[in-house]
Structure formats: structure tokens, C-alpha cells
Amino acid sequence: MNYILYILLILIIFSINNTFSIGSFVYTPDGYYNLYRINKFENFSKIPTKANSVNVEPHELYYPDICDSALKNKNSNEFSIDNFPGSPFLKANIKITKGSNMTLDPLLSIHPSYINILCIEGSFTAGSQQTLTLGGIIVLPGGNFHCNNCVLQFVDLSSTIIKIDPFGFLPGILSLGGSISLIGSQRILYSAKPIEDNVLEVNDISTLDPFNGFNVSIVSDSFPNVRTSRFTYNKNKLEMQDLTIPTTDLNIKLFFNDSGSLKFGGISTRTKSSIYITGDTKLHIENYLLDSIGKTSNKEYDDTKLTFSSDNPNNVTDIIIGKNQRFRNSLYIEFSNSVTIKNSVIIGNTGSSRSSLVFFQSNVNISGNLIVGTAGSSMIAQYGTEYIESSNNYFSLVLPNEFPTSPAFMDYGHEGNGIYSLSPNIFSTNDIFNGQKILYNFNFISRENVTGFDKDCFAPCDINSIVVPSLSQEPIDFSKNLVNPISINPVDYFLIVNSDEELKNTFFTIKDSTISSKIIVNLKGSGLVLKNIIGVNNFKLTGQVKRLDIYDSFFGSSTTPSLGDNGIKSSAVIIKNSSFYIDDFQLQNNQIYGSSIVPYLYELLNVDEFILVDSIFPTSQYQIPVGGKLDLIVKLVIISPVISRITCELESDNETITSSAISESVNKECKFPLTFKNDGSVNLKVTVKLKNVGDSEIMYIINFPKITIFSNYSFYSGWSMENSTENGIISVDGNSFKKGCSISSNDNSNNCTISNNIKYITNLPKLNISNDLNELFLNGITSINSNELVTITTRIDSETKYYQIQLFFIHQPIDDQPTPLSIYIENQPVFLLEPLESNSAPIFKNLTFNFDNINSLENINISFATRGNTYLTSMAIYSSLVIEYPIPVEKINLLPIIVPICVTVLVLLSILIVFFGARYYKHKKRRRLEIAVFGVELYSKKPSNNKSPVPSTPLIINSNQEQSSSNHISITVNRNSDIQTQSENNNLEPTTVETTTTTTTTAAGAILQTNVTLEMENLEIKPIINNNEPFFEDYSDEYDDSSDGAELNEDDVEDYINIIRGGNIKIEAEGELFVRQFERNTFDQEFFEYKKSKIPSPHLVPSLAHGDFIENPLNIIDILLDPVTNEIPLEHYLKTYKNRNGQSGKYRTNTQTHVLIADTIFQHCNDPDLPVSVSPYICDFGMNGRKSDLGEVCHDTITFKNKLSEPLYALFLFPEGDDSSITSSPFQSIELKPNVETSISLSVTLFSTTKYNEKVIVRFETLDVKQSWSTFVFLRLESELTNIIDFNEIIIKNYISEGTFGIVYRGIWRSSPVAVKLLKNEYVDHDEIEKEISLLERLRHPNILLYVGRFIFSGIHGIVTDYCSKGCLSKYIHENKYKITIIQKIRILIDISKACAYLHRNGITHRDLKPENILITSLNPKSLVCAKVSDFGTSKETNERYNLQTRRGTVAYMSNEILSQGSYTKSTDIYSFGMLCYELFSERIPYYSEPHWRIRELVLKNERPSLDQEIFKDTDISDIVTRCWSKNPSQRPTFDYLSKYLKHLLKKYDINNIIYDKDKKNKKKNKNNNNNNNNNNNNNNNNNNNNNNNDDHDDNNNNINDSDCDNNKNNNNNNNNNNNNNNNNNNNNNNNNNNNN
């Protein structure tokens, strides 16, 4: 009995001991600790592993059971050996149990003879300067270890405990969960600068007294490893006794140590040790020294291997101890989402290591640290690392002598890297690197190709990723804000990007950077984009990519990314707006059809300081019919006035090309009108050079894309991709598309076969307006597996040489990432990785390209590959010859069919001749417009050999057309349209056709020009009913193009009335034109088809006062967002449609009103002749004067009574919903029985501050539809006043300016002048908008621009602010007619300083202080307010994020600490204020004579603009400027001080009545010129009239914010020239006036 009780007691104790344990227990052979086995993903990431789906061994963590048998503490909070049972004189393993909260006795330290291993399941705190000497620490789940200024010293494990940890976690720290904090009380890491060879000045400290008696350890440019010296000091000057630092070393870090005692907290070791963090441990390390930590060397990994019993999976029979365990580093952190390492020093072990820092699936913030050691990498980020933010760290590396012999087993990171990453989410800003061969090495390997952790998830880590072998990566950007290093020594490579072939179709982008080192990429299956890159010094791009895009970049001599064998290899290349040095540029010849390669080659090395190529046309391969005309254009930007003597010369390899201008002197544009006479192709080259100078002074050579000249093509064959065995036909405009291709690669009997790796999809979204077209695009095919080629084989005629192929795709996005589309013909690429983007809505994609059948093929193979979410719906083939359609048919007797058909055709032709003859006279003066519907494309009815009127060439509308003509036709598809093509910058954009005759660009980049006539009367595209989001929104346009501005009359253009459905089409025509808008609705389809062609007679339309009924035929928001392109529609809109709402209180109505009331008798609802009584006829929703809350649903009821003896049918058209309101009702139609009251309910919800005045249109008709009446029911509701504004209530008055992020208009809101800023969607970050608005709402200061409210209209965000009519400060600095006195200048500066002082007191930095963002309200120094600070789009609250590192603002106004990659502080605004003062007084833009790239260098060298002694003779003014732009931020004054100082300065000038205006200095008395006064006055009157006109223009162009005044600076030269002429005319008059005065 006693034996049984004893056993039970042992089991209970054992179970209690193991309450902390997780995982299963594993038994090991004698001499080893038993192990616990944990599946890390299941226990730490909560990601379930499906049985037998993956090999779980790589996911398993084995840790020793040391804590099971450890001695546990008594119930005491004081940590001492007495509180643990057992001998205090032997090394012991002890454990602080769960719930215990122990603190080390302040008078004690832990001696190695007492403790071997300390296990913490409760809480343990060690205080200041206490030393813990022990073998290791194990933090169990839930445990907490706090080391506050304590010292940890690791020693070898006890020799008396003979058991071995097979996985070598100890000595060191092993954390399985809970939290660890290692925090020092004193800052230990400092920066310094050399004064003499052995003297340093230590930054940010006034005295070195706290470190008296210490040694100093130093890392610098010359010493990448730690060097230690004794020192003496005087205040913060440090003189080293054992070390000499060269004065040329600019990056010096130092820390202090007390001969190894680590007085201020740290870890040292007498043996090899490591820190292993897992289990979502919360880790915080700050002001702490980790010295000589780490076990893993840079040799090949050698992990411990376990052999398990075949009978028992929990029994290990043999163990082979690894000699180089991976991840036993200074710090290895995995599965931890809260890690902070700040202002600490991490020194690797004394030998070589793989890396000091290794992270795996963790979120880490590491900043302000020194990481130094002999290692393969300074930091390694593995799979699953969700987020690493590294900033202001100093990574110093000594390359090891040992490297692994094989890259297998995930043996990466040994190459000498700064940061090596297998994760894309690395943010490295302002980090300093010293000694590395490679700064950033990114290796994106699909997991199935990596042994070891081959099934580990990586970002984004989702539930299913563990069982998915390889996920496609999202597009990855390397930009200046994310990867922004400071490299001390030259490196071999700035960036290496590698991806194996399994990771396909991913775009990698390097952008917004100046790069002086090499980049190597291995992206065989992916694309690389270089955007806004400046390559200097040793920049070189090498490697291999599938597609290379280069945009807006400049490459200096010997830095060109040459293409081909000597540089980077790519199958497809896109080069636009980028310059290359002639001798270094090499271009491969095998370019695919979709490539657009237009480099600007230059020979003059500093050409970018004199002249730049702004744009060219055409920018991609161009197709044009024989006899067509084209303007070849090169637009230039002249930087230096020396380059006024330039000429452009055109060269051609085709003698049949004629041009009216072969060599032409130019100012800002070269233009060559060309005519093409014969079939074939031509290559053109334009040379821009200095006039009358030899070839050595060539500025640019531009080789234009190939131009193809062709005759018309005819329709040959078409196929619809249906899963159909029937030989059905879809007829579109007389062209037959056969249904279905057979799935068989060996079926030669069919004219179309498809590879068998496809899947079908049916019922794709209806995207058009014709049943035939809907049927053509209703079904589609794609590959079963992602990125797998689908091949279609179809017949062609072997004798025909030229074909065009047109493919119709529908893209249905599965996420917000673009889908790359690749197309091949006969295994040759046509398009590679064309990105299809559509946010969340499906899009229609039409791609057209040429095929030259030079091998006389009878069959052609067309292949495509996508992610699996883009479907080929149909295809068409066009032939250059008239050939019979290749579909076999049975031979039948056609005579009985042909004879009656011929008779019928003759009769119809006679009728048509009579009909069109009668119409000829009526239209003979009109410009004829002809359109046929094939998708949304235009085609020519020019006589050809086409057997049916189909596209002579299939065309795609494109938005980037640079042809222009004063007499042109333009059809523009709005930016919100879902018709998508590839634009000139290779982004998918809405499309535009704009022609001199007609010019069109295909999605392939091929541009077709042909003489196209468009006939609106033949176009009828019927609306469809679709509850899903349609592809094309309704749009109409009433456009007045007459010279006298008179509006069009509907009666005059009745035959031009059409219903157009297809994406906000803007139509400009010389002739008359009238189009109505009908949006989708829930009415009966047949009803609107019946009513659509009806236009109400004038006597049937209700009489409406001006503003009472205003249709909105123009898409307002898109015209406002593109004021340059839509100049004429914008002018028309501002003139005619000031706003939708018209006058306050007037009623609006639905745009389909005319449809519903057509052919009815309109009567007021109180009219006794109306056969139905309506009550109430004004609905106020029971408010009784109360105002509605936003979001409140307001209900009302309308009752109808039929006064007739027969039933009536009532149809209702409710107001259209928008961003400000929604009107809804369950009733759209009801039957009204005789003499019976019938009621309907409706509700209105308001979402903005608005006065809601709308109408419900009601149509009554008899059941036989022989009689019909219509009336209005009025809706009236008003919301509470909030800061959410209804855009419909804003009256837009005029365009002011456009900046990077938005467009600004002057407007009126509820009788108050306001500035309306529309934010461009491509720059909209909704979180940033909310932050800015939250900031604006809280700012209330007389010198800060007043925030009025916000709005959303048609998906566009807008901000409304106070309007300052006098414009921005820049105008008063740089325009002569606005010169201001010194008193006015000082008064303006006072207001600016007061505003900024207010911002800084509230923890806000402006970050973009410059004259363009200062608005002038008054020039009277006595006014309460003279200036206001605006544009808070770049402001940040410093108390929200302590480290403001987003690089924004104007470079000339950026302080040295920003440009040297430092952080934003309030003092950066002071620096900008100093530059503003300089510009204000000197009337010169800072660094105006320097190129953009030089400014940063000058600022960092502390070279400021020179102060003209004549201008800055007042030392008070010059003192403000020089103190504000001081290199040392701590020496800059505050805005509170500046405000007081400027007020004192204003009194000084005001008292002395000094007018400091250089324009008035030269006025002299001249009494001899009185006789010339009158003549000069006459001339001056004329000049004044011109000036007044200019004043009016300037008043309309006052700039508000967001670069609103940039145009002022750009136009200064022109203004100065005009003013100089004026001043010359007025010179005598001025002298005379002065004399008279």
C-alpha cells in the first residue's frame, strides 16, 4: 500500500513539474538530456499541419528537459540560494515557478558555483550593476526576465552534471515564450568626429565624466572591427593613448567599457554562447552591450541528427552531434511579433560567424545600433519574416576567411552581405554599411526548391501556405525610402536580386534612387523595372530577366545598363524617357513586337545640365496605311540659355518617305511632317545637335520605333471559345465567328484546336451593348495551372504573307495585384508579362498584332499564359489578301436561294438610293461621322477589297496621342471607363483616339493611322439590364463647338440623336451633335427600347426656370481631374454647368426624365386635369423643420388615387444616388385600380452636409398605352451641418493650378469663396487622407489656412479650404509687378513664424515650408493677418512617430540632416524657414544655378547660397538666415524666438521709415524730360492695359497649395522679358514722374 502511494506521489510531482511543458516527450540515450518536441508552426503560428501533407521534421524544435528536474523556489519574492532547497555550494539547475515574482537581492550577485541553469516560468528581475554568472537561462512560456542595467556572464556548463544538450542551445539564453528585457540605464553608443589624428569630439554629450576610468572601443571607416584604447578627456573632447584615427574618417561610432565589467549593462561570455528566441517572445534590448556572442560559424552548416526507433517514434536510439548548428547566432529570433533593439552594441564571436542577427517569421524594429563582427552577413532575414524595419544602424563587417563549400541546405548569407533576405519586407533607411561586398542580397526562392525549411511560409503567411508548395510573390519594390544606404567603402554590388524559375511572373522594381554600384539580377521568369534611376560612377546592371522596363532614368558615361551578352539579357525591353551615353549603350536586336525601345543617346557628357528630351512621338511601333501622314515630334527642355542654337536632323532608311522639313532650327520642339507612299517598313532617326557645329557636338540621337506601312486588311476567320460540339456561328457586322475549338492537338479535320490543359468558364460579365458582342465575349478559356501555356492552332492561307491577329480577353481579378499576360506566336514572344490591372472590377482587354507568314505556314500556333484569371473569349484573324473563309461546307444547289435574294437586294438598293439622295443636301456641309460597332473599335469605310465592312485594321483606342489639329475629331473614353489598353507608359489606362485624320494606338503598342470618317447616325448601342457592375458606364455629352458659342437646338439635329453606352465618351465635332444620357435602371427593358428614340416635343416638356432642371451630361469629376487634356470641355463646363445643384433650393431630377415623360402630357400634380390625385406632392419625411443626421434613414409615403373608371399603370423614376445621398423604394411600378387609393413607401439617406431637393418622376398610362400622363413629386430634406460637404453644392468657378497630388479650383460653397482640391487617385492613400484631415480639423490659428470640409464624389477625394485671393508668396518674390517692401516682407515672415510656432507647440512638423506654400491675404503691414501657411500634405505629428523619415519636400529647402539620411525634427522647418528668408530677400531661388543632383552635395558640405552684401547689409536679417540654416540643428533658433525677433526688427524699420526695395533705388530726378511725358504716358497706357489683362489673368491663377505656385517660377523668364520691354517703354516716364513728384 505504501509503495502504491509512493508511486502516485511521484506521478503527481512529475505532472506538476511538467505543467509548463509543451510538445511531446522524447527519450534519448544515456548521457543526454531527454527532449521535448514542438511543431513550431502548430504551437507558435497556430497554422495546422495536415496529416501526411508535408514532412513535419523541418518544423520541429527539440529542447532539453533541464527544467523538469530543477530545484524549485520557496514561496518568497527574494531571490537567494537559501530559497531553493538543496546544497548552495554545488552548481544546480533551479527554477522560478509560475506565479512567483522574484527579485535578486540588491547586495548580491549570482556566483557560478551556485547556479548552472536558471529556468524562469514566473518572473525574475535583476537590478543595477548586479552580475549573473551562470551557464544559461531558459525562459519558459509565460515567464518574464527583466535585466535592468544588470550584467550577464555565461560560463561552461557544470562538469558535475554529465548530461549533454544535443542541440547546443546552452550556454546562452533559450526563450520559449514570455518576455525578456535587457535595458541599460546609461547611453553607451555615441558618434564622434575627428579633430586631430588621436583626438575625437564626441557628439550629443557635454562631458565624459560618467566614463572616467573606462576604455573606449571604436569602429570607423578605417577600422571595421572593434579597436580599444585608453583615453583622457576634457569635457567632450577625447584623446586616445593607444590608437590613431585618420581625420578623413567621417563615420565613427564608439562605446565605453570598464575592462570587461560592463558597468552599464551587457552580456559577456567566457565560452561560446548564443541567444535563441522563439514562441512569440516579447523582446526589448536597449542601451545594452552583447559582446562576443554566437556559435554558428560561416562554414557549412552541420546540424544534429537524431535516429528514432522503428518501434517507438518517441525513442531516440542514436545522436550525431552537429559541429556547426545553424541559428546559434548572437541573436536568433523566430515566431516573435514584438522585437525592439535600440541604441545597443552587438559584437559577434571572436571567430567568424554566419551572421550576428538572424530573423525568421518575426516583426522587428532595429534602430540606432552598432552591429560589428567577422561574418558572412550583418543581418539575415529568412522566410516568413513579415516585417523588419532597420534604421540608423551602423553595420560594420570584416569578411571571413571561411565559406561553405556548397549552397545546399539553405546555406545562404555567407557572401559578405550587409543584409541578406529571403523576405521582401525589409525596410532599410539611413543605415551605414562598412566593409561589405554586397549591400543588399535578396534571394527569392520557391520553397519547394529549398531543403531544410522547404515548407516554411513566407510573407504573406496565410493559413494554407504550409501545404502550398510555392506561392507567387507579390510585386516587390526597392525604392529610396525602403532601401537607402550610406556605404562607406566601395562595394561590389549595391543590390543582388535572385529568383529561381519556379517563382514566375513577378515584377521587381528599383526606383527613385541614385546608384553608384553594380546591380545583378537573376529573374529568368520575372520582370525588372528601373524607374527614376540616376546611374553614376560604377553603376552597372547585369544578369538576366524575362522583361526589362526602364522609365524616366538617366545614366552617365560608363554606367549604361547595356543589353545583350555584355550586360543584362532580356527577352522584352521597354525604354521610355531615359537617356544613355552613346558609346556605352548596346541594344540587343531580337526585340519582340510588344517592346517599345526609344533610348535618348547622348554624346556630350554633361548634356543633362544643358538640354533634356521631354518626350517624343511616336513612342512605340507604329502602323500606317499607304498614303498616310504622320508628324514625327521631339519635345525638348532647354536648361541652359547657351542651347538656343540647336537644330534637328532627320534620317531615314526608306527613300519613299517624304517630309516637308528635313533640318530645322528649333526652340523647344522638333516636328517633321511625313508622308508614306509605299508598303514596307521604315526606321527613322533624329539627331539633336548644336547648330553649325560638327558631329562632336551631338546632343541626342533618337532612334524611333519601326513604322510599318500597309494596305488594308480584310476579315479572314474568327472563333468563339465555347465548350461546344455544335458548329454554331456568331455573326458580328457580317463577320462569322465559329463557336468552339476542339480539344485535340492531332485533330487536323478541324480548323481550330486547343491544347488539353484548359478549363472553360461561362457567363462572363456582359460588357457591351449588342447581343452578338455579348455572345462573343460570354465564354472563355484559361489554363488549369497558373502560368501554363494554352495553345490554339488554327488554319491560315499559306500564300498570304501578312496577317493581323486580334485576341479578346476578359480579366477577372482574384486580388489587388496585376496579372501578367504573355502571348506567343509559333513559340516566339509577342507580348511578355503585360500587366493587367483592374482594382476589383473585371476589364476587357483587346490585343492586336501583326504576323508575317514568311515560311508559308498552313497552320499557326497562338499561345498565352496568365495566372489563371484572364480568359480568352474569342479571336479574329485578318488577311492582307481577299481569301475565302476556311470553313468546309457541303456543296448544295444555291440557285433557288440566290435568285430571290438578288431580287430583294435590288429592291432594297433602289430604296436606299432614294432615301440617301434625299438626305444628301441636308448633310453636304457637315463633316460626316461614321462608326461601326465591333467591340468598341473604329474602322474605315474607305473603299477596299474587304468582302464585308469590317475593320480595315482592328483598332484599339489609346490615351497617349500627341497628334493635334485645330480641325479634328476626338473620341475620348474617360479614365473611369473599363475599356482598358496599354498606354505609352505601359500602365493600363482608359483609351483615347485623337486624329488629324484619325490616329489610333493598339494595345500592343502598334499605332494605326488611317483616314476615318465617323457616322453617328448609324450607331445605336442599346442599354442592358445588369445588376452586376457593368463594364461601361453611361455617358452623354452636349457640346457646343460653334464659333459664336450658341447652344445647339435639338430640332436641328434630330438625326444625330443616339443612345451611347460605353464609357463616358467625349465627342468633339465641327458639325452639330446631340447625345442624350441614359443610365442603367430597373425599368422594363422593352419599355426603354421602345422609348429610347423618342424626344419630347417642346410643348410637352414642362417649363423649367433657369437652374431648376440641370442635366449633367458631362462627367464633371474627370474633366476637372484632367484640365489640360479637357481644356475645351472644362471651359464649357465652367461656363454652362457651374454645378449640378444649381441654385440653392432648386430641384434636380434624374437624367432619364426625358425618357419617362416622352410622348406624355405633363401636368402638375395639383392640376385637376391630371387623372390621378397625389398626396403629398412635397415629401418632407416628417422632419417638421428638424435636420437629418448623416446616415439617418428617413421614410415617407406617397398616396395615389386613380380618378378614372379604368385601371392605370404607374411607373416611377427615383433620384439617382451618389456619394451624398441614396433614395430607395421597393416600388418601381404599380397598378392603380379605379377610385382606389394606393400608397408607395420610399426612404432617403444623406451622407453629407446637403440641402436635398429632388423629384420623383411619375408616369401614368392606360393598360393599352394609348394615353399617358406624367408629373413630379418633390422631395425636400436638409442635413445637419458637418465637415462632410456635398460636392453638388460647390460651384466651381475656375481652374487655379495642378500639382503632383491634386488639382485646385476656386469655388463657391454656400456663398463663401473656397479653394477646392481634388486629390488624384493614383496618389491617394486613404490612411494618409484621414490623418491629414484629422490634422486639419484640429488646427485653428489665424495664420494657418482654414479647413472647411471634405467630400467624396465619383470615388475622388477632395478637400475644401479657405480661399486666399492674392495667391502665394512666390508670385511676390519673382514677378516684377508684384515687388514688395522690406516692411511687407518682415510682416509676412512674422505670420509664418507664428504659424509654425503653433504647429511645433502641438508636436507637428510642416516638412515642406517654401514660398509656394505661403498664401498672401493682405499686403498691408497693419492688417491682422498678412500670410497663411498651407499644404499639410507632408506634415507629420512628431508625437505620433518619433522617427520621421519620409523624404518629401523641395530639395533646395531640405536640411543637411535630412539629405544625410537623418530624421526629421522641428529644426528641419527652421532650416527651410532660413532658405525661405534667403529667397524672399535675395529674390533668387536657393541654388538656382546648380543642377538638381548637385544640391544635396553642396548642402552636406555646408555650402550655403552666398549672401549678397548689398542685399543683406543689415546684419539682423543676415543673422536670421545664417542661424536658421546652420548645419547643427541645435544651434538653430525656435519659431517662438524668431517671431519675437522679427517683431523687434519690424519696429526698427517702421520707425526709420526705410523702404528697402531695390526696384526703387534707381529712381532719379530728371527735369529735362517733361516734354516727353505725354508721349510716354500714351505708350504707358497701352502697356498698362496689357498689364491689367495680365493682372486679371494672374488673379484667376492664384495658387493655393500642393505646388500651386510652381508655374510662377516656371514663367518668371517670360514675365521678366515682358516686363523688361515695358520698363524700357516706361523708363523716361518713370524719370519724369519722379522729377514731378
From Swiss-Prot:
Family: In the N-terminal section; belongs to the GDT family. In the C-terminal section; belongs to the protein kinase superfamily. TKL Ser/Thr protein kinase family.
InterPro entries the UniProt entry points to: GDT_regulator, Kinase-like_dom_sf, Prot_kinase_dom, Ser-Thr/Tyr_kinase_cat_dom, Ser/Thr_kinase_AS, STKINASEGDT
SMART domains to which the protein is assigned, alphabetical: S_TKc
Listed transmembrane segments: 897-917
Enzyme category, top tier: transferase
Stated name of the protein: Probable serine/threonine-protein kinase gdt2
Signal peptide positions on this chain: 1-19
Side of membrane Extracellular, spans: 20-896
Localization per Swiss-Prot or TrEMBL: Membrane
Disruption phenotype: Cells initiate multicellular development prematurely.
Lineage of source species: Eukaryota, Amoebozoa, Evosea, Eumycetozoa, Dictyostelia
UniProt topological domain (Cytoplasmic) ranges: 918-1637
Active site: D1408 (proton acceptor)
Organism encoding this protein: Dictyostelium discoideum (Social amoeba)
Biased composition (Low complexity): 991-1000, 1568-1589, 1597-1637
Location of the Protein kinase domain: 1290-1547
GO molecular function, one term: ATP binding
